[in-house]
């Protein structure tokens, strides 16, 4: 009987050790804890297709600089991210009626500080003008009397609609397009003399489609990119996210993601 009891105790000890080993392996490999990740609260992020910041990968899932930054930043705060494609013109309405939790899509904070609660900046981006390689447009002042294409509700649109107070010349026509992909077609086909957008997005398009545009040396502005939450949001998530951005900038995470 004593031998039997000793055998039971030994078996119990071995089972306990095996259980500890499994738990230790789970701790050492948190990325495999799918059930834990699935239990995390979800943040719904609204964006639109804008390579290299946000676009659909070959597997059909959202990818890009903003997607990776959002996944890392919200992950540090204990959230799981779900990116949804939105009508960019309705972004403010969507965040205010809680259809989405925030707007994250290479979104400029400048001039919009009072419209939203902001987290950031997490990056800085130049808003620039691009022309065809054979164009005689060399400076911003050369845009006088020309046709320029922009995406509607963006910072370049705002700058050109208020051209005089922003030190920009009077255009012959400003095309404000809902679909930003049409910007490049409009310029390529000669319907516009120039387009204005984030420099990184223009360079990504040229790389993806082997197209050569010339970017003017003088930028329209250098924009602070941030994450926009509803103005009336009642918690401190925007401030928490700003603090995480500061950590990610300090520890090199942002630089690592952007340089991939």
Q: What is each stretch, according to the model?
A:
Residues 47-49, 124-131, 207-246:
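Periplasmic-binding protein-like
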């Amino acid at each position: 009987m004593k031998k039997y009891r000793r055998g039971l105790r030994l078996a119990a000890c071995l089972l306990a050790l095996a259980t500890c080993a499994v738990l230790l392996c789970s701790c050492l490999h948190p990325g495999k804890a799918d059930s834990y990740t699935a239990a995390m609260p979800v943040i719904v992020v609204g964006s639109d297709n804008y390579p290299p910041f946000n676009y659909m990968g070959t597997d059909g899932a959202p990818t890009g600089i903003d997607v990776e930054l959002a996944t890392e930043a919200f992950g540090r705060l204990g959230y799981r991210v779900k990116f949804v494609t939105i009508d960019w013109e309705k972004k403010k309405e969507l965040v205010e009626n809680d259809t989405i939790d925030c707007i994250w899509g290479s979104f400029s904070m400048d001039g919009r500080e009072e419209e939203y609660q902001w987290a950031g900046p997490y990056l800085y981006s130049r808003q620039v003008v691009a022309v065809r390689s054979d164009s005689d447009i060399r400076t911003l002042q050369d845009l006088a009397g020309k046709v320029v294409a922009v995406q509607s509700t963006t910072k370049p649109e705002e700058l050109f609609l208020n051209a005089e107070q922003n030190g920009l010349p009077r255009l012959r026509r400003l095309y404000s397009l809902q679909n930003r992909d049409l910007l490049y077609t409009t310029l390529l086909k000669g319907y516009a003399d120039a387009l204005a957008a984030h420099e990184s997005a223009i360079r990504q398009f040229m790389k993806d489609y082997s197209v050569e545009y010339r970017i003017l040396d003088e930028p329209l502005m250098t924009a602070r990119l941030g994450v926009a939450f509803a103005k009336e949001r009642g918690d401190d998530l925007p401030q928490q996210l700003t603090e995480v951005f500061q950590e990610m900038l300090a520890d090199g995470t942002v630089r690592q993601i952007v340089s991939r």
